[in-house]
Amino acid sequence: MLNPENIRNFCIVAHIDHGKSTLSDRLIEKTKIIDERYHRNQMTDDMDIERERGITIKSHAVRIPYTAKDGKNYVLNFVDTPGHVDFSYEVSRAIASCEGAILIVDATQGVESQTLSNMYLALEHDLEILPVINKIDLPAADIDAAKHQIDHDLGLDSDAAVAVSAKTGENIDALFEAIITTFPPPKGSRDNPLQALIFDCHYDPYRGVVVHVRVFEGMIKPGMTIRFMNTGGEYKVEETGTFVLDLVKQDSLQAGEVGYIIAGIKTVSDVGVGDTITDAAAPCKAPLSGFKEVKPVVFSSVYPTDTNDYEELRESFEKLKLNDASLTWEKDSSLALGHGFRCGFLGLLHLEIVQERLEREFDQSVIFTAPSVRYKLTMRTGEEIICDNPADYPDEGLIASAEEPYIKATLITPTNYLGNVMSLCMEKRGVQTNMTYLDEKRVEMTYEMPLAEVLFDFYDRLKSISRGYASFDYEVIETRPTDLAKIDILINGKPVDALAQLAYKPSAYDKARLVCEKLKDEIPRQQFKIPIQGAIGSQIIARETISALRKDVLAKCYGGDITRKRKLLEKQKEGKKRMKMIGDVELPQSAFLAVLKTKED
């Protein structure tokens, strides 16, 4: 029987690209839980997208054995977490299942914005924090500066920081010993009533839902009937086990352990991430506190390219939702694109990942409309409505006022790029609320700005103007009054509802012009002239024209009378006019994608 005193549960958190997954690889490699032949980079990242982009999207739990220098055998359960701000909810879920957190600081970059936000997240859950300085093998590494920042910026004890190289494995032994001494063993007893937190789940096509749990009190074993305290569902446990990269069957899970349960759960909606599991026969008194439910901030409509694939797309979303608890979707329809779904995402990266997963894992060909945020509208009647879809936007005359969501953005930038970063924030309607010099080379700034402005190209432009050195983290704070307008896009005089966008009125002209220019490049030429117009209400504010393809009707006239030529040209003109009246323009999928990527180049 495993003694809880010999268990350590911790997660690995850091800013993007500071080396979380590489450190996980070294921890796994050092304990030799898998054969050297099967070693590869990013062992904890399962998805092809994660490997290709070199990012972590899903948190991944791993259990490794370790024999300490004092001869005792320990079991370490750790969770490798994502670094991107879009997936910070994954980090909060991992943190809720641990007693400690390894906070990695890159020796070449120092403390960045998500280093701070992840530390605050860990402190909120009373986690013990172990600072680790990574990438000490690089020529540009400055360990003393990193230690100073850990002391000064994070307020942690820099003497306790372990300097390692996750790439070469240097100093990994010292890190293992620090994990044992720094992190406390889990509390709880196997004799108490069962209390376990669901911190994740995934779908297995053969066995149903695999629930990831951290047992706080009591024990779970096959044959027991368990109850989900939030939803009230009861299930008989078929199998319990732990994660050693793959699922490894165990006889039971007891207080302090992290593992999985298979209980014949067939539908995704029955598993609430953050719910508490207890014994149906002897339930515990109260559920665990769980964690904040994640709210989507970016909305987009998704349509199948072929309208006959609607049912297949719905099934794909149901399966995707199981592995991605933060994705929300409901039915939607468009005159131009038929039936589809209105989806909520955590950010643009999340939207891109969902799009790629639909195409790769489920073989779906889909069209995404331009992303939008959730606006709060007050009607002249006094009624308040929430609108995230331009198609549902009421007539402007009926709206008394509109509010849009604002974010509190934390930016850390080298002083050389301070002017560039400030002018970008001002261009995006940001208002500076705080500015602190962390040291002579780095500045931390806080801005309040509309979420809609950050959606499109803010992150890309921030990275390019600061040569990749500035970092950015944000949280949604509140809604504030705004001057809102709906831009309709008309093609050949007909509005295309899927291309409509909601925008800040003073910048509506630029936005409409950009969309029209993009569409002009994407829509193939026809036999007749095609006007592309951007309009607010009945007022046209931008226009581009795709010129017609013309057959040379004068080719057969050699010399001859001008009236004969004129007659042929007039006849062609009449035919074109008639064609324009009945001609429909087919929009290629690339036209919708081009609108998604509308940027000031």
UniProtKB/Swiss-Prot annotation:
Keywords: Cell inner membrane, Cell membrane, GTP-binding, Hydrolase, Membrane, Nucleotide-binding, Protein biosynthesis. One of its GO terms (cellular component) is plasma membrane. The gene is lepA. InterPro entries: EF-4 (IPR006297), EFG_II (IPR041095), EFG_III/V (IPR035647), EFG_V-like (IPR000640), EFTu-like_2 (IPR004161), LepA_C_sf (IPR038363), LepA_CTD (IPR013842), LepA_IV (IPR035654). This is Elongation factor 4. PANTHER family: TRANSLATION FACTOR GUF1 HOMOLOG, CHLOROPLASTIC (PTHR43512:SF4), TRANSLATION FACTOR GUF1-RELATED (PTHR43512). Residues 5-187 form the tr-type G domain. It is a peripheral membrane protein. The keyword Protein biosynthesis applies. GO terms for biological process: positive regulation of translation. The keyword Metal-binding does not apply. Belongs to the TRAFAC class translation factor GTPase superfamily. Classic translation factor GTPase family. LepA subfamily. It is found in: Cell inner membrane. It catalyses: GTP + H2O = GDP + phosphate + H(+). Its EC number is 3.6.5.n1. Required for accurate and efficient protein synthesis under certain stress conditions. May act as a fidelity factor of the translation reaction, by catalyzing a one-codon backward translocation of tRNAs on improperly translocated ribosomes. Back-translocation proceeds from a post-translocation (POST) complex to a pre-translocation (PRE) complex, thus giving elongation factor G a second chance to translocate the tRNAs correctly. Binds to ribosomes in a GTP-dependent manner. The lineage of its organism: Bacteria, Pseudomonadati, Spirochaetota, Spirochaetia, Spirochaetales. GTP binds at residues 17-22, 134-137. GO terms for molecular function: GTP binding; GTPase activity; ribosome binding; translation elongation factor activity.
